């Protein structure tokens, strides 16, 4: 018993020690595993972060490059627009010059036509005269024949001897009649030919003009063709831009293909990950980490998809911008067509097209601004994405902190589990049965276990697996619930983002509306300022008008007073004259013989004229007052309308502001409700998360039970993890080394294909050049080449031998490659055809010859042994040991860690490559090609030297099959030079033909001159017939001359027929050109229709501008009305001044008449016997009359007093007029200053309104105005008024000088001068 107890106690002690050792080992292993997992996760997170940053930087670089491209395109478009504007200006200048030249040519053609018409009329008159002369000659000839016949009948008996002579004369007569008839027929023919010749000459001139016009049209067509070439260049540039855009789209497609490839890789990795999860279901930490990585990859893929969508949106925007650019180009084409039609239209259409161009430029600038705004919005989106990335990084860091906390909690749970295990061991120690059982187990470790123990272990493991499966199912359910909650959260976040986007859109709309309000407020403020200025000016002008009205009233009062005084004076004068109170002594004066009736009549006439002038002045004053009242009423009405419009605008703005405030409040309420709903949902999700946390706590409790069983599996896992880590590191390094090589091989293959295509095109080009050279070569050269080919046929045998040698070399190389090949398979991508990778096995092959089925079996065995070789695994693990140590010891925060890791990776990769080179000895690294090319006496170099020799010999003997390109190009150049020389010769022939045509024209002119000479000869013949002295010789000479003329005319007709044929050919060409021009006109008509539609749209746009401009036009009309009022006031003042001058002249005339009466009385007193005393009022002198007034009676004194009072009144009036004139000059200076201010204001407004065309002003409604006098015609120009001359003094001076000689001439002329002077004021008053 003692022995048993001692043995039991020893066993228990040993068990405790072993359990403690096992616990320490487990702790160390768990800590190492945790650190390894954390390092792996950190490594992966850093890798993902680096990948994200690289992608982000690449996207930023691509966007910046796209923005730079767009800017360059915009700059190119602006440069093109400027060049097009310059071309348009040049074309317009050329069109103007062409028009002027065409107009001048048309004027010259009209002048020539008029000259030809005059010549035609002259020729017709000449023909009529010749016909009349011919008829008269015929009549005379008939009369003479009758006379001859009558004489012959009477004297038949007397002239029997002369019968023969008579017969001869009759025969001659018949001949002459025949010749005359023939001459008449020839004359008619010549007449017809002359008319036809005149018509043909006119037609030729018109055709020449038409040829000139055709030349001008050709020049215009050449200009149009140049413009078409410019448009084609534009098209080419657009196509280049489209190709660039296609390249960008290809790059994007490649990026999408790479993304698809990355997604495929991710799917493969996911599959591998699922396989590992199926193998290792018990590792929950790894499962959670993998799920987190899976979710992160999903999130990254979603981000990538969003970026792809954004890129697609940017592509659509670029496409839209390109479509807009194409539309702009089409609009520019239409404008070019308009320019072509503008060559035939007037200047008005040209101005309209210029206005359209300006509008299109504005639209182009607005579109550029829109594009810049879109680019800024894209930049904002990129900034938002970067912010989201930062937020995701923050969330990743928070998740890492939560993982650290969870691991700490797991360590705490492990400690609690160990404590529980200790407690269980103590409990087992307390129980003897459990201790015996455990001791029996430990004792019998070396022995094979019993069947019952195995069954118990199986039962326990099965129960444990059942519990684990239940826990795993519960965990899966919890994970599914978490996924659903996450999906809901994502949906809620998306809804929140959408609401935020809507908020941003609404804020943008609000900002846009605020900007519009600010613009309108600025417009209202400017309009208010302008109104204030206008009102201020109006008030000033109103005050000036009031002052002028007050001055007019004062003047009218003064005028009324003067008129009343004059009326009283005239009334008293009339009463005195009627009463006959003038008492003058007979020896001193002639008043006793003065007729009172004549004096009364003169005074009555003067008084009537003055009254009429006064009535007219009153009527004018009333008319002016009426006009002023109407204008003041209109100004008040305008003020009221302006105030009403401003009040309406203010009310509308207030209503809009109230609507905006209401909308803002509604939006705030809506978004507050939405935020409350989001908060409620967040609370719900927090409750769900708390429930999930409780479930997780329950799972952790179950996890504590599973930790005990994990200790057995961790030993196995440590080995597998080490192997996996080493394999993963080796695979990563090999993948990093393989993929760049594969990408380089892909790039080299694409370059090879491209170069092969270029070589093929170059060879085709060479063949085409050679075929052209052979086709264009002369027959002699071909014969020489055939002879040379016959001589040199033996050279083809050398080439055949060379081909056989090269085929043998290629077969030997293929044989060596097939023997040394240890390939397993070749991999080809699905979307990249023609690019593959060779996968080889590393085991050495036996070089024995086997049959085919044995070779296939051996290949399968070699592949199996290579894929499951332990040597390769050992080599990889041994080479990656150093790297695994560095990864295990690496700290993520230290800088030295990166350098150590890179150095370890280099060393491990070098070791791995060395060991793989030892394993894969069968595959030769260096090919035999380099050796063969390096050797000097190799077969390849020998063949190259032989080929060079054969080619040189072929060149020497000039074989056709191997003609170099230089010779073919030289032959082509020679042939092209020959063609150019032929063209030059053809042009010389054409010019010689033109010279021949000019010579033909000269010959035609000479024929015209000869025809004129023939007409002169005909006239001479007629005169010769009239003279009756026609001899036979002269008649024959005339006939010969006529025959020569006929021959010349026939030659001329032949030439004319040839010219007519040429003209018919030219007419046919003209008809062809006219048909082409008709087609062009149809196209132009279609373009005009499209332009009319564009004009309608532009008119619709212009209507809005016109509505805005109407207010300004109304203000301008008000200003013009005020100016008209001012000018009317000025005219009224002028009329008043003229009336005053007329009254003053009239009063002076009265004074002059009185002076004349006094002089006549003093001079004609001695000649009282004469009864020729008449009233001579216009000749009076105040000083002499005053000197003789003392000698008379009281009536003379009364007259003197009356005249003195009249002169005093006149002096007072003259002084008052001078003062008024001074005031008028002051008023005029003030008005001139106001006009200058108005002129400057109008110039500013006109400068602001110069962008609007003249048609806008012509369509404006101008109210009807009263007809102005001739002095107010220059109001529209706002010219400063000129200072009026003081014509009162000069007029009085002239009248005084003119009246003196009339008094000296005779006394009988006094009544006439009196009546003339009496009528003069009335004319001036009118």
Curated annotation (Swiss-Prot):
Superkingdom of the source species: Eukaryota
Disordered: annotated segments: 1306-1326
Gene: CCDC171
Protein name: Coiled-coil domain-containing protein 171
Species assigned in the record: Homo sapiens
Keyword Cell division: no
Coiled-coil boundaries: 53-294, 323-391, 450-561, 597-630, 660-707, 765-792, 979-1143, 1217-1241
Keywords in alphabetical order: Coiled coil
Disulfide bonds: none
Presence of keyword Coiled coil: yes
């Amino acid at each position: 018993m003692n022995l048993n107890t001692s043995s039991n106690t020893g066993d228990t002690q040993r068990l405790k020690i072993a359990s403690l050792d096992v616990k320490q080992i487990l702790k160390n292993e768990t800590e190492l595993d945790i650190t390894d997992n954390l390092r792996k996760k950190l490594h992966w997170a850093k890798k993902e972060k680096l990948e994200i940053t690289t992608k982000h930087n690449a996207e930023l670089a691509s966007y910046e490059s796209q923005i730079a491209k767009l800017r360059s395109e915009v700059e190119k478009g602006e440069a093109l627009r400027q060049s097009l504007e310059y071309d348009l200006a040049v074309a317009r200048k050329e069109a103007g010059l062409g028009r002027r030249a065409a107009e001048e040519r048309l004027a010259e053609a009209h002048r020539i036509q008029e000259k030809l018409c005059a010549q035609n009329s002259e020729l017709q008159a000449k023909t009529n005269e010749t016909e009349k002369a011919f008829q008269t000659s015929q009549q005379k000839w008939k009369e003479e024949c009758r006379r001859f016949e009558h004489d012959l009948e009477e004297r038949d008996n007397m002239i029997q001897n002369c019968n023969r002579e008579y017969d001869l004369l009759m025969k001659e007569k018949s001949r002459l009649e025949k010749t005359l008839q023939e001459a008449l027929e020839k004359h008619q023919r010549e007449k017809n030919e002359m008319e036809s010749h005149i018509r043909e000459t006119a037609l030729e001139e018109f055709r020449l003009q038409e040829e000139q016009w055709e030349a001008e049209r050709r020049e215009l067509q050449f200009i149009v063709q140049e413009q078409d070439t410019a448009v084609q260049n534009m098209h080419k540039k657009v196509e280049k831009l489209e190709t660039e855009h296609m390249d960008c789209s290809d790059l994007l497609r490649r990026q999408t293909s790479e993304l698809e490839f990355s997604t495929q890789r991710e799917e493969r990795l996911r599959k591998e990950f699922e396989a590992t999860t199926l193998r290792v279901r018990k590792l929950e930490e790894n499962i959670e980490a993998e799920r987190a990585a899976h979710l992160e990859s999903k999130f990254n893929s979603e981000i990538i998809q969003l970026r792809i969508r954004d890129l697609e949106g940017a592509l659509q925007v670029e496409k839209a911008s390109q479509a807009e650019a194409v539309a702009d180009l089409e609009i520019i084409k239409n404008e070019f067509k308009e320019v072509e039609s503008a060559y035939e239209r007037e200047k008005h259409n040209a101005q309209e097209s210029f206005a359209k161009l300006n509008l299109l430029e504005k639209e182009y600038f607005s579109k550029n601004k829109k594009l810049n705004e879109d680019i800024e919005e894209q930049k904002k989106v990129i900034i938002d994405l970067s912010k989201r990335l930062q937020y995701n990084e923050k969330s990743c860091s928070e998740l890492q902190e939560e993982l650290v906390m969870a691991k700490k909690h797991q360590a705490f749970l492990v400690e609690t589990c160990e404590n529980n295990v200790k407690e269980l061991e103590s409990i087992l120690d307390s129980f003897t049965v459990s201790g015996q059982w455990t001791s029996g187990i430990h004792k019998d470790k070396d022995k094979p276990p019993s069947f019952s123990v195995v069954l118990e272990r199986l039962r326990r493991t099965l129960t444990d697996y059942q519990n684990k499966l239940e826990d795993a199912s519960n965990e899966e359910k919890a994970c599914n619930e978490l996924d659903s909650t996450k999906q809901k959260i994502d949906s809620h976040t998306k809804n929140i983002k959408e609401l935020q986007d809507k908020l941003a859109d609404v804020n943008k709309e609000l900002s846009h509306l605020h900007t519009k309000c600010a613009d309108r407020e600025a417009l209202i403020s400017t309009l208010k300022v302008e109104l204030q200025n206008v009102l201020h000016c109006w008030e000033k002008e109103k005050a000036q008008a009031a002052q002028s009205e007050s001055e007019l009233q004062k003047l009218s009062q003064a005028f009324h007073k003067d008129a009343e005084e004059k009326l009283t004076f005239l009334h008293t004068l009339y009463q005195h004259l009627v009463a006959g109170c003038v008492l003058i002594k007979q020896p001193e004066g002639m008043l006793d013989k003065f007729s009172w009736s004549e004096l009364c009549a003169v005074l009555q006439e003067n008084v009537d004229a003055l009254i009429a002038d006064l009535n007219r002045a009153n009527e004018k004053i009333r008319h002016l007052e009426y006009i002023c009242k109407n204008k003041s009423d209109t100004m008040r009405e305008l003020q009221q309308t302006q105030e009403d419009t401003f009040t309406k605008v203010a009310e509308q703005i207030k209503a809009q502001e109230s609507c905006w405030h209401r909308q803002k409040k509604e939006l705030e309420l809506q978004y507050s409700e939405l935020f409350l709903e989001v908060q409620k949902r967040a609370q719900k999700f927090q409750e769900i998360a708390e429930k999930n946390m409780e479930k997780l706590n329950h799972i952790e409790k179950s996890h504590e039970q599973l930790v005990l069983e994990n200790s057995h599996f961790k030993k196995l896992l440590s080995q597998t993890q080490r192997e996996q880590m080493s394999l993963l590191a080796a695979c990563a390094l090999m993948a990093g080394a393989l993929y760049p090589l594969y990408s380089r091989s892909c790039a080299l293959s694409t370059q090879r294909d491209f170069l092969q295509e270029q070589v093929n095109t170059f060879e085709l080009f060479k063949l085409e050049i050679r075929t052209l050279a052979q086709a264009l070569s002369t027959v002699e050269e071909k014969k020489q080449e055939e002879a040379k080919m016959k001589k040199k046929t033996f050279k083809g045998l050398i080439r055949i031998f060379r081909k056989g040698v090269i085929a043998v070399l290629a077969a030997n190389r293929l044989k060596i490659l097939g023997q040394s090949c240890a390939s397993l398979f070749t991999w080809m991508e699905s979307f990249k055809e023609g690019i593959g990778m060779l996968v080889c096995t590393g085991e050495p092959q036996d070089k024995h010859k086997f049959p085919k089925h044995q070779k296939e079996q051996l290949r399968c065995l070699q592949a199996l042994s290579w894929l499951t070789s332990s040597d390769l695994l050992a080599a990889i693990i041994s080479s990656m040991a150093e790297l695994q140590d560095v990864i295990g010891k690496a700290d993520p925060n230290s800088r030295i860690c990166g350098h150590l890791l890179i150095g370890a990776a280099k060393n491990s990769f070098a070791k791995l490559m060395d060991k793989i080179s030892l394993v894969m000895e069968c595959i030769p690294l260096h090919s035999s090609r380099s050796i063969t090319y390096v050797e000097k006496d190799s077969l390849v170099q020998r063949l190259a030297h032989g080929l060079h020799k054969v080619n040189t010999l072929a060149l020497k003997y000039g074989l056709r099959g191997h003609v170099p390109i230089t010779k073919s190009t030289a032959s082509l150049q020679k042939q092209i030079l020959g063609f150019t020389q032929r063209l030059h010769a053809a042009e010389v022939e054409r010019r010689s033909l033109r010279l021949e045509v000019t010579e033909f024209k000269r010959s035609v002119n000479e024929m015209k001159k000869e025809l004129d000479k023939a007409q002169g000869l005909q006239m001479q013949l007629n005169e010769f017939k009239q003279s009756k002295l026609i001899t036979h010789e002269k008649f024959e000479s005339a006939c010969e001359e006529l025959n020569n003329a006929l021959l010349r005319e026939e030659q001329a007709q032949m030439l004319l027929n040839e010219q007519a044929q040429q003209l018919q050919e030219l007419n046919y060409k003209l008809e062809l050109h006219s048909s082409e021009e008709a087609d062009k006109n149809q196209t132009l008509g279609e373009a005009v229709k499209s332009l009319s539609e564009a004009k309608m749209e532009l008119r619709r746009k212009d209507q809005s501008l016109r509505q805005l401009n109407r207010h300004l036009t109304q203000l301008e009309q008000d200003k013009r009305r005020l100016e008209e009022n001012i000018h009317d006031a000025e005219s009224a003042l002028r009329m008043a001044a003229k009336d005053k001058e007329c009254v003053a002249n009239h009063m002076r005339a009265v004074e002059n008449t009185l002076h004349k009466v006094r002089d006549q009385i003093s001079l004609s007193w001695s000649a009282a016997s004469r009864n020729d005393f008449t009233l001579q009022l216009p000749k009076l002198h105040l000083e002499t009359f005053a000197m003789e007034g003392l000698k008379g009676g009281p009536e003379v004194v009364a007259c003197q007093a009356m005249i003195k009072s009249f002169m005093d009144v006149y002096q007072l009036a003259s002084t008052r007029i001078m003062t008024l004139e001074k005031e008028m000059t002051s008023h005029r200076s003030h008005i001139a200053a106001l006009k200058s201010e108005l002129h400057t204001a109008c110039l500013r407004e006109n400068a602001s309104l110069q962008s609007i065309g003249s048609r806008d002003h012509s369509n404006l409604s101008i109210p009807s105005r009263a007809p102005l006098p001739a002095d107010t015609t220059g109001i529209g120009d706002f010219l400063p008024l000129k200072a009026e001359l003081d014509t009162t003094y000069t007029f009085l001076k002239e009248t005084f000088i003119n009246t003196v000689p009339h008094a000296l001439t005779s006394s009988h002329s006094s009544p006439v001068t009196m009546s003339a002077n009496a009528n003069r004021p009335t004319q001036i008053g009118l």
